[in-house]
Amino acid sequence: MKFFIFTCLVAAALAKHAVKDKPSSEESASVYLGKYKQGNSVFFQTPQDSASSSSSEESSEEISEKIEQSEEQKVNLNQQKKSKQFSQDSSFPQICTPYQQQSSVNQRPQPNAIYDVPSQESTSTSVEEILKKIIDIVKYFQYQQLTNPHFPQAVHPQIRVSSWAPSKDYTFPTARYMA
């Protein structure tokens, strides 16, 4: 279900992006309204042909509606291609019922075959095992943080030293005491 919602959101975002890049509907209708001439397997449109299009059998409104519908179909096809390509490139887990998974493995139907359908108990035990593993991992990381601190535990205050007033209890650390 999440995958379906995600693909819908991606398709909506792509549609908004395509609408921004697309010229206005009046410009696109005026571009496609003319008759197309064929010459040497190349189609082209001339401004004179677009002016004489009013004498055609269909009105310009019907032509523009057909053009808009065809453009919408092209946009929809492009969006579908992009969403299919995105879904193939990404590695989302496929959500299937157990019967669908089994039928994809066994191509030929076997009337006497017994399918391995996981029961509710087996899925609940697997969830419990996963939770135990997660708890163990969390405990391990907490132990790591306690035994190997990343920051010093105690910060000792530093004594301010002034070069103007020498300290009275100044001693050399290498001097030996004479007794």
Curated annotation (Swiss-Prot):
Q: In which tissues is it expressed?
A: Mammary gland specific. Secreted in milk.
Which interval of the chain is the signal sequence? 1-15
> What ranges does the record list as Polar residues composition bias?
93-110
Q: Where is this region: Disordered?
A: 44-121
What the entry lists under InterPro entries is as follows: Alpha-s2_casein, Casein_CS
Q: List the disulfide bonds.
A: none
Naming one, the record's GO cellular component terms include: extracellular space
UniProt function note: Important role in the capacity of milk to transport calcium phosphate.
Which PANTHER family does the record match to this protein? Answer: ALPHA-S2-CASEIN-LIKE A (PTHR16656:SF7), ALPHA-S2-CASEIN-LIKE B (PTHR16656)
Protein name per its UniProtKB record:
Alpha-S2-casein-like A
Give the encoding gene's name. Csn1s2a
